[in-house]
UniProtKB/Swiss-Prot annotation:
Subunit structure: Homodimer.
InterPro entries hit by this protein: Cold_shock_CspA, CSD, CSD_CS, CSP_DNA-bd, NA-bd_OB-fold
Protein name (database record): Major cold shock protein
Name of encoding gene: cspA
Induction text: In response to low temperature.
A Pfam family assignment: CSD
Length: 46
């Protein structure tokens, strides 16, 4: 809904902020709560 959210890491690390522009997929970019994803953490401006 908001265009952003947080990913909870399996290893218990801090939640990771994710913006819809960072999702690598075709068409409507969305993630569902509880969906398993793979990701790489990058430092942003904030």
């Amino acid at each position: 809904e908001k265009g952003f959210g947080f990913i909870t890491q399996d290893n218990g690390g801090a939640d990771v902020f994710v913006h819809f522009r960072a999702i690598a997929s075709e068409g409507f970019k969305t993630l569902a709560e509880g969906q398993k994803v793979s990701f790489e953490v990058e430092q942003g401006q904030k």
